[in-house]
């Protein structure tokens, strides 16, 4: 699942992984405070969920979304990646340093799959 500016990087990673034989999907989380219960039921049944965001990994959507999945009975593997180093977020050139480029997202997915 991706939100905001991380979406296109996550899409690139998902396309490359699917082409190489690792079958994964991608969900665009368009709103931070509203949950689509039909989609949440599908995610609860998934073997793993990775949240990719351009916000701080400690305070962004990922930490909150993981809690919402647990409330609904999620038992799979979970991780969230986002900005994690002071002073190196914002510009696309810095996303690789944060692990938020296509390669970093692919590595995070493979670690869960």
Task: Label every PLM stretch briefly.
Residues 1-113:
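Thiamine diphosphate
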């Amino acid at each position: 699942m991706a939100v905001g500016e991380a979406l296109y990087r996550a899409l690139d990673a998902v396309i490359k992984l699917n082409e190489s034989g690792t079958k994964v999907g991608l969900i665009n989380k368009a709103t931070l405070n509203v949950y689509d219960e039909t989609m949440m039921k599908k995610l609860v049944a998934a073997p793993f969920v990775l949240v990719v965001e351009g916000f701080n990994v400690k305070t962004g959507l990922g930490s909150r979304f993981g809690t919402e999945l647990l409330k609904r009975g999620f038992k799979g593997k979970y991780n969230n990646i986002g900005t994690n180093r002071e002073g190196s977020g914002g510009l696309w050139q810095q996303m690789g340093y944060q692990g938020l480029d296509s390669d970093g997202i692919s590595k995070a997915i493979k670690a869960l799959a």
